[in-house]
Amino acid sequence: MNAPSSAAGHVSSHWRQYVALTKPRVVQLIVFCAAIGMLLAVPGAPGLADLGKALWATLGIWLVASAAAAFNCLIEQQIDSRMKRTAWRPTARGELSRTQALIFSAVLCSAGMAVLHEAVNPLTAWLTLGTFVGYAVIYTVVLKPLTPQNIVIGGISGAMPPLLGWAAMTGEVGPEGLILCLIIFLWTPPHFWALALYRAEDYARAGLPMLPVTHGNEFTRLQILLYTFVLLAGTLLPFVQGMSGWLYLAAAFVLGLRFIHYAWRLWRNYSEALARQTFRFSIWHLSLLFAALLVDHYTQDLLTL
């Protein structure tokens, strides 16, 4: 009786290790932003055909994003093993080999590309593949270990999800999708630098040139503050472009000013606890901002009926 139970437990444990490779929380935010792009691209309530395409697009983007996360774990196996934040990952602990991680990533990426190319459209498939290469190869292999501007330059690939969603529904790269992409691009540096502030020793131990390691704590805090002002300006573009109404504009101001408030406090009087709070708020900022944009989108449609 014990042998089947032991085998089942082993399979379950192995499955959890593969799931952990995909960085579920990170991929969840990626898929959320892509879904927002899909819904905003459709005027009014989406029909059955739109929902079907959106579901296929969500599946494909989720698979490729998971593949990129797994490939990142493969490349950073040694780095992850030296950092407290990432030492638990299956590749860092030696629970999964590089070969297993590579095969897993390749299968996920191939499946995702097939779904996007055949069930959505070729443009979305190729843009998603470009995003995979941008994150898994250009950012992870080239930028991250070489320059403190890794987050800024590499942020282009991380900013792509809403543009992928927009392309999935429209078959083109429109200015609206690019604006959504720009917002995430501007949001990325203050988000990650807040994390890097209280993980600076971790990054230094791993030999990664994150901004707090190369330029110091105070300089990084100033950059976070400056970026929050630029980000606030960027979040106004949907209103300027006519993508949104006053409801979104109000939300963008409230959320942006709150982010600036966190950054200001962080710059004036640093503490690790405040850096953690700023990092956590940045996630809420992006999530609530895009949710407000979606609510505004449907509110405007109701008002025009």
UniProtKB/Swiss-Prot annotation:
CDD domains for this protein: PT_UbiA_Cox10
Keyword check for ATP-binding: no
UniProt keyword Transmembrane, yes or no: yes
Keywords recorded for this protein, A-Z: Cell inner membrane, Cell membrane, Heme biosynthesis, Membrane, Transferase, Transmembrane, Transmembrane helix
Highest taxon above the source species: Bacteria
EC main group: transferase
Family matches, as HAMAP family: CyoE_CtaB (MF_00154)
Function: Converts heme B (protoheme IX) to heme O by substitution of the vinyl group on carbon 2 of heme B porphyrin ring with a hydroxyethyl farnesyl side group.
Protein name, entry field: Protoheme IX farnesyltransferase
Gene: ctaB
